[in-house]
UniProtKB/Swiss-Prot annotation:
Keywords: Lipid droplet, Membrane, Transmembrane, Transmembrane helix
Main location class: other
Transmembrane stretches, start-end: 38-58, 69-89, 90-110
PANTHER family found in the cross-reference section: OLEOSIN, OLEOSIN 20.3 KDA
Function as written in the Swiss-Prot or TrEMBL entry: May have a structural role to stabilize the lipid body during desiccation of the seed by preventing coalescence of the oil. Probably interacts with both lipid and phospholipid moieties of lipid bodies. May also provide recognition signals for specific lipase anchorage in lipolysis during seedling growth.
Region (Polar), start-end ranges: 1-38
Name under which the protein is recorded: Oleosin
């Protein structure tokens, strides 16, 4: 019989089949084998490159030791020439950098405008429709107001009221309607 401890211990442990364990062992073995082969292959390459770097460094030091007297002798000619060439190269590099920066900026702006060009007509159509609706609304309100003024004028004309002219021509000073001085 199994105890509570045995049941708990056996149910909480992961269940592996024998095939899963052997597959895991094979993967681990193949990974370590591939790492070993990579180290064996790259060790000579790294050693050769390190040796070439050392030879290049030693050659540079020997060349500098041999060329130093020539630099001292020809320094009145070499220094201005090196400065001139250095400044020219710096100018060309700066010019190229500014040109590439300008081209990339223009390219960015062109792409941004091209992407927004699809949404601009929709926005323009919306604004155009809104302005047209506002114009129609203002026209209708103007027409209604004109009709209201016309009907009010007819009503006043029918009743014989003359006070309208006094209100238009008069003011706070108490001028008469016909007096324009």
């Amino acid at each position: 019989t199994t105890t509570t401890y045995d049941r708990h211990f056996t149910t909480t442990q992961p269940h592996y089949r024998q095939d899963d364990r052997s597959r895991y062992d094979q993967q681990t073995h193949s990974q370590s084998t591939s790492r070993t082969l990579a180290i064996i292959a790259l060790l000579p390459v790294g050693g050769i490159l390190l040796g070439l770097a050392a030879l290049t460094f030693i050659g540079t030091l020997i060349g500098l030791a041999l060329a130093t007297p020539l630099f001292v002798i020809f320094s009145p000619i070499i220094v201005p020439a090196v400065l001139t060439i250095g400044l020219a190269v710096t100018g060309f590099l700066a010019s190229g950098t500014f040109g590439l920066t300008g081209l990339s900026s223009l390219s960015y702006l062109f792409n941004m405008v091209r992407q927004t060009a699809g949404s601009v007509p929709e926005s323009l159509d919306y604004v155009k429709g809104t302005l047209q609706d506002a114009g129609e609304y203002a026209g209708q309100k103007t027409k209604d107001f004109g009709q209201k003024i016309q009907s009010t004028a007819h009503e006043m004309g029918d009743q014989g009221q003359v006070g309208v002219h006094a209100q238009v021509g008069g003011g706070k000073e108490g001028r008469k309607s016909g007096d324009r001085t």
